[in-house]
């Protein structure tokens, strides 16, 4: 979501999640839900998570991070990671460093100073998916492990905190074994996460309290938003909803 320009950007895989078919694209909607450009940026493979920094949109696209100029939709450049298996979400911190999750590869990548490389590989990541940054740490919504052929897991994913100075990985209180986590945002004094497999939207408060906000069907994916209004995609239904999570 781009409050500055009053747009919502939507990634459309248009194929299998790991298929390099060049048919993926980005759509642009107004913040009141009106579709302005269905194929705003084309030629992608299977685009997923996105982040905005300094007038540019960065898009995770299987094994590359694509940089798009927001004012024009111009494709500026790619940052490639040939060893990545399924780049998923993207987040930017205040100094311009970007972090990208590789869910299938069980790794986190970092773009810093024009260099895009694997930053952390650790089994404790539990197949990282959604990302956000808060209070000097990278917060990770993990999918769980091991990943079966149908993407179910024996062990549910947790909400993790990675200190950006020490790289220490810990579980967040109340965020242990939540589910097959996908979307993640910081809202007020807690985190809102989505469970893709169960279709559950949950809030994990800083005090460690879990609250189920809504329960829908399978396919609840990445989350965007501003304030207490979230934009929630339903990937199996081809639908986007605005959801209020005001306390």
What spans do the regions from the language model cover?
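Beta-rich, blade/repeat-based domains predominating
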Residues: 1-5, 22-23, 41-58, 82-99, ...
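Beta-propeller domains
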Residues: 10-34
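Recurrent small/Gly-Pro-centered beta-turn motifs in extracellular repeat architectures
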Residues: 11-13, 61, 102, 142-144, ...
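Short glycine/acidic-enriched loop and turn motifs that connect beta-strands
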Residues: 14-18, 64, 105-106, 145-149, ...
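WD40 beta-propeller blade core
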Residues: 27, 66-67, 107-109, 160, ...
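Short loop/turn segments that connect beta-strands within beta-propeller blades
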Residues: 29-34, 69-74, 111-115, 163-167, ...
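A short beta-strand motif characteristic of beta-propeller blades
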Residues: 34-41, 74-80, 115-121, 167-174, ...
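Asp-box/WD-like beta-propeller blade repeats and closely related beta-sheet repeat scaffolds
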Residues: 64-97, 101-107
